[in-house]
Amino acid sequence: MSKLNKSIIAEFESAQITRQVPQFSQGDTIVVNVKVKEGNRERLQAYEGVVIATKNAGLNSAFTVRKISHGYGVERVFQTHSPIIESIEIKRRGKVRAAKLYYLRGLEGKAARIKEDLAATAQEKLARKTVTAKAG
């Protein structure tokens, strides 16, 4: 592929990315609000779990979220810039050293817990306080 074609594709992809997505990484617990279409109605469904993998590839970026539902592990892959994602909320920052947390699939109960990154959580709280203080 020539440089011209690559630049055209990159320009097109950057135009398609319209929404700002919060910065999250593996180990973080997030809530993804997904638009679900049922018949002629559309509603929001919250999917809360731990991010076990991310793929950063511009418009084709994706992340995998794992949760335990009724005793069974459920994983769902979301396209980061998909129109079905209404919002992404970070509940808790996790402290992990691995890039992919696939080892969580073999763990259950307390063994599958992830240590909280207290430093990142404190920084976010401080940032929110300063924003509200400036606004008020």
UniProtKB/Swiss-Prot annotation:
One of its GO terms (cellular component) is cytosolic large ribosomal subunit. The keyword Ribonucleoprotein applies. Keywords: Ribonucleoprotein, Ribosomal protein. Signal peptide: none annotated. Transmembrane segments: none annotated. GO terms for biological process: translation. This protein is located at the 30S-50S ribosomal subunit interface and may play a role in the structure and function of the aminoacyl-tRNA binding site. This is Large ribosomal subunit protein bL19. It comes from Xylella fastidiosa (strain 9a5c).
